[in-house]
Amino acid sequence: MKITFLGTGGGRFSAISQRRMTGGFRIDNLNGKNYHVDPGPGALVRTYQFGFDPRNLDGVFVSHAHTDHYNDAEILIEAMTRGMTNKSVLDGYERWGPGISKYHQSHSKKYVLEPNQVENINGCSVKGTKTVHGDPEGVGFQIDYRGFKISYTSDTGYFEDLHKYHEGADILIASVLRPGNKSIRGHLCSRNFIELLKEVKPKLAIMTHFGLKMLSIDPIDEAKRITKETGVKTLAAFDGMSFEVNTQNPARIRIKTL
């Protein structure tokens, strides 16, 4: 199993400026299947840039109906046969979405997840996780393959029970928009992430989806500080970062730059 980050920028200003790419990330060879998670602006181009073929996708995960998460979903759906998402991306909710046209929906198998709802997909259990964000129908995801769990918070503010949705995660991937205590509604800052890691205690934590304030410092230094404070190995993802998942010892990885 391999995880590759096709973009690590987050929020509208990072997406517009492209100081970091916004292509989301891929999970490849998960029980022999390949998935793209939150394909924001440029995801298709970055797919080819980093040596992948979108026609080999088996699924697309879209957490919510904000452009930096769903922008390239339609063109990826053109290239594959299944889509996985949340309700507002497909149906819309008040002023959010829909992000996927009826035409593209008709050409893929759809799974709509809500918090704690579980779907069995290609030999994996996929659970929706609660988020507190601008899109009230948004979700994160926890993928369970033979007891090995990868959790993704997507965009969410910190709330008291957040850790319960990501309980048991071996790898926790989180959208951490801002450094230090610089919290903003609907997003995690480093302080929030530290609290979450102390509660979930994953074997490996990865920060991504960086806003301009995070990028104005060095996210790598921020990750080192978080590692020291929590005892959880924490990485700051970068564009083109790729690694094979070590299911026996997730914290022991060899990172490649594509």
Where are these regions (language model features)?
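Conserved beta-strand hairpin/beta-sheet module of binuclear metal-dependent hydrolase folds
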Residues: M1-F50, E137-S154, I171
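Active-site neighborhood of phospho(di)ester-bond hydrolases with catalytic His/Asp-centered motifs
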Residues: H36-G40, D58-D68, S151-T156, L172-V176, ...
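Active-site metal-binding motif and surrounding structural segment of the metallo-beta-lactamase
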Residues: P41-D91, D170-L172
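Structured loop/turn residues at beta-strand edges in well-structured enzyme cores
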Residues: F52-R55, N122-C124, E167, V200
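A short helix->loop->beta-strand "cap" motif at the edges of active sites that frequently abuts
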Residues: R82-Y93, V200-A205, V232
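Metallo-beta-lactamase
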Residues: T85-V139, Y145-R146, N246, I253-I255
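Cap/insert and terminal regions of metallo-dependent hydrolase folds
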Residues: F159-S242
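Binuclear metal-dependent phosphoesterase catalytic core
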Residues: K233-L258
